[in-house]
From Swiss-Prot:
Localization terms from the record: Cell membrane
Cystines in this chain: none
Membrane topology, record value: Multi-pass membrane protein
GO molecular function, one term: xenobiotic transmembrane transporter activity
Record protein name field: Multidrug export protein MepA
Length: 452
């Protein structure tokens, strides 16, 4: 590894290292919000509600593809960071090559399986009538691009894993920028409508993925694109999947949770859904900043888990303090000006009152949410597969029984408070798991550097 990478992993101040790894991730997390609304924004100019609905309905599919990217990106990436901490650059070649080519093969398999059934999948996503055709057309392009989408997410994770978070951010920026350029050309210039929006996303992911490939092929000594290195061993696959599978499950289950929350809110009318939508988008920004902070330091924790546990512990302490400061600032703003902020999005008195209440409740959960993210990332970084799996399942399922109980007891108020209660349970569960594993957070370097 180059001296600059080693400097942030081993020598710089904790705060400086944290910002080096996390700031690009924070920006990237915020970019993901923009990425999610780009196609809807441009299609909106066509004034066709069926097209807008079609793109909205396909968002869960993109989330699932991102989850598959986590399977090898997070699983392989955290393992690579630990190998770098053990100074085993040779084995990192095998892990990276296996993960890269496996993600491509997985993408091809998904494309082959799904392409003949786009109409049926569109129906499962609740598309009907004219919307069904638009949704199916969008899905065809999305599934065709699956290998490139998954590879993009894997390589973006690898950039952070080897201490190149700025390269990760540049890759994400290029993807968003290219999409912004292509969407109007394809949608309006070539009159491709929904297909144009899908093509814009597919091409931007492919080009961003190509950027990563070119960069890593020329300027790195820790990753390998040599197919001869894509030879998995049982131990290697265990290390990758014991973290990759929980990371995959977490994204999928959290998507299911979002659908369940919407189903409960729908029983109370459009004003409840609208109020939640406003508060969700407002909380999403500080939440994504904290998520970027927590996920950004995962390579730093993974590296020092092997090389310097004191630095690892100090990193966790600094991140917790940073999360607390962000929470305090955001909570103060909401308590002082929450009502006025909500009024920027709606003038309906009923929506403003309910959205302000939801905003205060969900913002209260921000601190606990941040701790949950951090400790889950810590479990991933240190290779604690069982703990990471428990947290992934908990973050996606705990809220469901809480919703049923509180909804039956307190109605809409119970549904709203269930969000905070579920986050509280998950945060304390994460703390309990980390505490119970405190004596197991050790590593046998021989197990990391053995090359079979």
């Amino acid at each position: 590894m180059k001296d600059e990478q080693l400097f942030y992993f081993e020598e710089s101040s904790i705060f400086k290292a944290m910002m080096h790894f996390s700031l690009p991730m924070m920006i990237g997390s915020l970019l993901s919000v923009i990425y999610g609304i780009l196609n809807i924004y441009f299609i909106g100019f066509l004034d066709n509600s069926h097209m807008i609905s079609a793109i909205s309905l396909t968002l869960p599919i993109f989330a699932v593809l991102m989850a598959f990217g986590n399977l090898f990106g997070v699983g392989g990436g955290t393992y690579i960071s630990r190998l770098l901490g053990a100074k085993d650059y040779i084995k990192s070649h095998y892990v990276s090559s296996f993960s890269i080519y496996s993600s491509l093969v997985l993408g091809l398999i998904i494309a082959v399986i799904t392409l003949p059934f786009t109409d049926q999948i569109a129906s499962i996503l609740c598309a009907s009538g004219e919307t069904l055709n638009y949704t199916s057309d969008y899905l065809k392009i999305e599934f065709l691009s699956t290998p490139f989408v998954i590879l993009f997410f894997v390589l973006e994770q690898f950039a952070r894993a080897i201490g190149k978070p700025i390269i990760s951010m540049i890759g994400m920026l290029s993807s968003v920028g290219i999409n912004i350029i292509l969407d109007p050309i394809l949608i309006f210039g070539l009159h491709l409508d929904v297909v144009g929006a899908a093509l814009g996303t597919a091409i931007s992911n492919a080009i961003a993925g190509l950027f990563f490939i070119i960069y890593f092929s020329r300027k790195n000594e820790t990753l390998s694109f040599n197919v001869k290195h894509a030879k998995p061993t049982k131990a290697m696959m265990q290390e990758i999947f014991k973290i990759g599978i929980p990371a995959f499950l977490m994204v999928v289950l959290m998507g299911v949770t979002g659908l369940v929350v919407n189903l409960f809110l729908a029983t109370y009318g459009n004003y409840a859904i609208a109020s939640y939508g406003i508060s969700f988008r407002l909380v999403q920004f500080p939440e994504l900043i904290i998520m970027g902070l927590s996920e950004g330091v995962v390579p730093l924790i993974a590296y020092n888990f092997v090389s310097n546990k004191t630095r690892m512990k100090d990193t966790i302490k600094v991140v917790i303090v940073s999360i607390a400061v962000i929470f305090a600032v955001c909570m103060t703003v909401v308590l002082v000006a929450g009502h006025s902020i909500v009024q920027l999005f709606s003038t309906d008195p009923q929506i403003v009152v309910l959205a302000t209440f939801i905003l205060k409740v969900t913002m209260t959960s921000l601190l606990l949410n941040g701790i949950g993210f951090l400790f889950t990332g810590m479990l991933q970084a240190t290779g604690q597969g069982r703990g990471a799996t428990i947290m992934a399942i908990a973050q996606g399922t705990v809220i469901i029984p809480v919703l049923f109980v509180l909804n039956s007891l307190f109605g809409l108020t119970g549904v709203i408070w269930s969000l905070l209660i579920a986050e509280t349970v998950c945060a304390f569960l994460a703390m309990f798991i980390v505490y119970s594993l405190r004596n197991r957070l050790t590593v046998d370097k021989a197990s990391l550097i053995e090359v079979e």
